[in-house]
A protein has these predicted regions:
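N-terminal export/targeting signals for secretion/compartment entry
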Residues: 1-92
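Intrinsically disordered, low-complexity prosegments and terminal tails associated
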Residues: 54, 63-331
């Protein structure tokens, strides 16, 4: 049996980017949770070689699922239920929509010769979690607390992760007062991993060919159906959270996405970091409870961010659809 220290170490190996207990599950963890609850997890390919399918990873998933339930179910303070689902506003598009396949193919041609020339084992991104503080009178104060994550790793699977709090803001978008309990710039996690300890999913270097990229995402990214855009985006999100792709690799990634059906334009949007982009929604044919939003740079077509939106159908959730349940914006 594991003692507490060994159990914690194994959970970190399974999910090295896990943030403190009030953080939401990652895009990857949400995908795994949905596959387990819908029964899709049983459809395993015998050729897969995923580190994250090991028993410690399942334990980490169950822990993350517990924290998800803690965040979305009502809290009981003084006998009065208080919803704590303060989330960012849903992205809305404007202007003339662009056809997804046409736009990404045009962007792929532009990106192929762009820097960097070689991939970098590093990723920097902003994600978010919900915080709720309980006052002495039983009232609550909910706010969105972004986190800035930097992951650096090496071929021997050693590396570092640093998590810094961003500027907290209220659900309607205004900045919280200076008295907000989570100040911007505070380091909430700083950890180093020795060789072999970092649980990187896409350890192999990404390919520069579109067909090879599709196979790469399917093999390492846990994709059950390559024609399910939501599943594909979950794998893409994991990849971009581990690598800074070369221009040729990013081009191949976009070309591979052009072959995936189900993307619909929502028009011009501004992502969570204030960047101009084009938004495309993707609905899984097997899970109508959520849809994904992919934001591409309006000029270059580079992938800027992704969001997950709850559409309804989960009675236990305490918030009304549509509600953003997670976002990640790469820098």
């Amino acid at each position: 049996m594991f003692d507490e220290e060994e159990l914690e170490r194994q959970l970190r190996r399974a999910d090295p980017a896990t943030t403190p207990s009030n953080a939401p599950p990652s895009v990857r963890a949400e995908a795994d949770l949905r596959r387990i609850t819908t029964g899709a997890a049983a459809k395993k390919s015998p050729q897969r070689r995923h580190r994250w399918l090991a028993l410690p990873a399942l334990g980490a998933l169950l822990v993350l699922a517990f924290f998800l339930v803690q965040q979305v179910l009502p809290s009981n303070v003084g006998g009065n239920p208080t919803a704590i689902a303060a989330t960012p506003p849903v992205l809305t598009g404007t202007g003339t929509p662009r056809e997804f396949a046409v736009f990404v193919k045009e962007a792929a041609a532009k990106l192929r010769d762009q820097e960097p020339e070689t991939p970098i084992r590093e990723a920097s991104y902003e994600s978010w979690n919900v915080n709720t503080d309980f006052n002495a009178d039983g009232s609550t104060f909910s706010y969105v607390s972004p986190q800035e994550v930097t992951t650096t790793w090496r071929a021997d699977l050693s590396g570092e992760i640093t998590v810094v709090t961003g500027t907290p803001y209220l659900p309607e978008g205004s900045i919280t007062p200076d008295t907000a309990p989570t100040p911007a710039g505070a380091i909430v996690r700083e950890e180093r991993f020795i060789a072999g300890e970092m649980g990187i999913v896409f350890a192999a270097e990404p390919p520069t060919d579109a067909a090879a990229m599709s196979a790469y995402l399917t093999e390492y990214g846990g994709i059950e159906d390559p024609n399910d855009p939501a599943q594909v985006l979950e794998a893409v999100g994991q990849l971009l959270s581990e690598w800074t792709l070369s221009g040729a690799e990013h081009s191949a990634l976009l070309e591979s996405l052009a072959e995936v059906p189900g993307f619909e334009s929502i028009g011009s949007v501004t992502d969570r970091l204030g960047r101009a982009g084009l938004g495309f929604s993707a609905q899984s044919p097997t899970d109508p409870r959520f849809h994904s939003i992919l934001v591409l740079d309006a000029t270059t077509g580079e992938i800027l961010s992704m969001e997950k939106v709850y559409l309804g159908g989960v009675p236990e959730f305490s918030f009304d659809p549509p509600t953003v349940t997670s976002y990640i914006a790469w820098k």
